[in-house]
Amino acid sequence: MWKWKVILLFLAEMFVSGVNGDCACYEANNVTGKSAPISNSYMTEDFSPCYLPCSYVAYSGDETYGWTGLVLNWKTTTNSGGIIQIFDGPSATGTPIIQVAEGETIAAGIGKSLIKSSLPVITIKYSQTGSGASMFILNINNGTFVTNVYYGSISTAAGLAPIAVSTTTTAMPTTRSYSNPNFAYDPYFITHDIFVVINQRTSGGMAALTSLNALAINFVTLLSTTTDINSVSSSRLSLATLTPYDPYYSVQGGIWELSATDVLNNVPRSGVTIEGDIDSALIGLADLAFTVNKNASTDTRNNVQRSVVLLTAEWPSNALLGDNVASKFTELGLNLLVVGYNLTDAETSQLLRTDRWYNAINSSDSKITNVAAFVNPFYFNNGANNFWCPPFGITNSVDGTYSWFQEPYNYTGPHGINGVWTDPFDGQTGRYCNFANNQYVYQNNAGGSVKVQVYFELEAGKDFLNFYDASNNLIASFTGYEIAGSSFFTSTTTLTARFTSDNKSIFRGFWVSITPQP
């Protein structure tokens, strides 16, 4: 707590004093408490509104309490480019976790009101970017001064992990030490609900089954695991084996209750000789463990990726993975990875068919390098052929008046000029992927100005859609959630959009249109 008090005292000297002539900031000093008010500047003699760029720091007073529940209403707007920004931490730097444009109402319990800070300290800032007024605007009709008039507040809520008091001057590391040249990133940070499925039927006997088990074990022991349905990091695990009879699978242990050690102790130790039904088993497991908001112990998490990893040392001719399986997985926002082991050429050709909707790989061994061969391209999204996150290039509209692109490929949010996010996000399907690093390039061949409209729902402060001009200067950045979308204009000859996401929460993504202006 003392470190925040020191910061607040320091910032009290740094930030605007709150007075410019007779115009004063509504909150001229930094605040400590459970609620922080947000309102326009005022004239000291009569409290009439005026404009002053204002900023202050709010501290919850408790390391375990962050900030959320923003509500904001506008009584008067002046088209002067007013903007309210809330930053995570004790300075107005970096990307704000919440940004509210002039005239945008924030209602309690939805949209931006739900965004939470990750620290007990936030910075609240108001500024104007337009030419409406430097101090205020004169209303010629009645001779009074008017400017943007707004009022709101943001409150604290429990939920932050307490910050441990350090006994040394060495800063606590934010990431764990890890170095393995086989992996693009540390597998410990993979955040998925993962159902490992092992096919007990194999013509390779115990040697092949043992290798399948080793692949599964070498994979899950790399992960950080949890059983908490409310967590937004780490992976939850389940395990099943394929069997010859309906429902063609056998769940080993509790669904979403396993650790890596549990998987190690429950992999199959013997095989079966009768062929099962892989398609039916996958559909059944999908329905069993990958629905949201049913208030059941088998519920999947709303804001994480989901995957079934099927390990098999044979690929039977009756395993089609056809439209019925594909539609079920799409309906549930679920991904499939098939890891074959020493499959024949004919089996490999059938599994890796060109029209597949799932990820697949044929492994010749069960070493860490073989695990990396499917973790890197699919879990780390670090490859050109990831069917979980297929690329969606810039596309021309049917009438040729604009170009557009989106992510994910099955984006379900608003489109067009007047689109609005209306449906609450249940987290079942239509979500982007972790570890994204995707680029979209638009060539402004006609020259002149273009209007870029963006609808976005991203993890606030962690996942970003950034736009750059031809000189690679950042000209717009989007994160968090915008109910009615945002837009900007640019005349750059080359417009580059880059989308990046971290390893944690995922949401409904974005839709972008680029329209040449007359």
From Swiss-Prot:
Keywords in alphabetical order: Glycoprotein, Secreted, Signal
Glycosylation sites: N30, N142, N295, N342, N362, N410, N503
Tagged with keyword Secreted: yes
A Gene Ontology cellular-component term: extracellular region
InterPro entries (UniProt xref): Sperma_CUB_dom_sf (IPR035914)
Cell compartments where the protein resides: Secreted
Signal peptide interval: 1-21
Domain of life the protein comes from: Eukaryota
Name this protein carries in UniProt: Uncharacterized protein E02H4.4
